[in-house]
Amino acid sequence: MSKQADEVMSKFTPDVETKKVDTSRKLKIGIIGTGWIAESHILSYKKMPDVEIVAAADLIPGKAEAFMKKFGVEGVRFYPSHKELIDNEELDGVSVCTYNTAHKEPTIYALEHGVNVLLEKPFTVTLDEAIEVCRAEKKSGKILTIGFQPRNDANMKMIKRIVDSG
């Protein structure tokens, strides 16, 4: 494996130190990018009583507002960019739901500003970007996780039923 590939793979090795989030209050979450993939994030967050969506950003004027209205999420502040959202809010985390080619910048910016990140897959589109994101995560001490949990996928449920049946 190359040195770069080793560095990326080391990201997926558990750290000895466990990172913690204060769960004594509702977690304040921002949504960056309000396209179709953000729908699954919103629907999941709405099921969590200890999570509050407080802000959303999208480059297309009015898109974030329409998105939140569609899902009945009220009291959200809207921003035209991820930088303005992160600079103006006290957040526990953000969901980065932008185009695949635009994952790196908001992820690194959030981490550098002390915000945990749930990054939609794919992680990045190049190895160099992946290394930059991994370095930012390690330097920040914040949590970065990738949103790929297919446990509710119909195919996965069928596979689980088959496995469980013996």
Show where each model-derived region lies.
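N-terminal Rossmann-like dinucleotide-binding module
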Residues: 2-73
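Structural signature of beta-strand start/N-cap positions in the alpha/beta core
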Residues: 28, 52-55, 90-93, 116, ...
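Acidic-histidine catalytic/liganding microenvironments
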Residues: 48, 88-89, 153
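Short, conserved SAM-binding/catalytic segment
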Residues: 66-75, 132, 136-140
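Beta-loop-alpha module in the N-terminal Rossmann-like domain of NAD(P)-dependent dehydrogenases
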Residues: 76-136
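A contiguous active-site-proximal alpha/beta segment in oxidoreductase catalytic domains
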Residues: 124-166
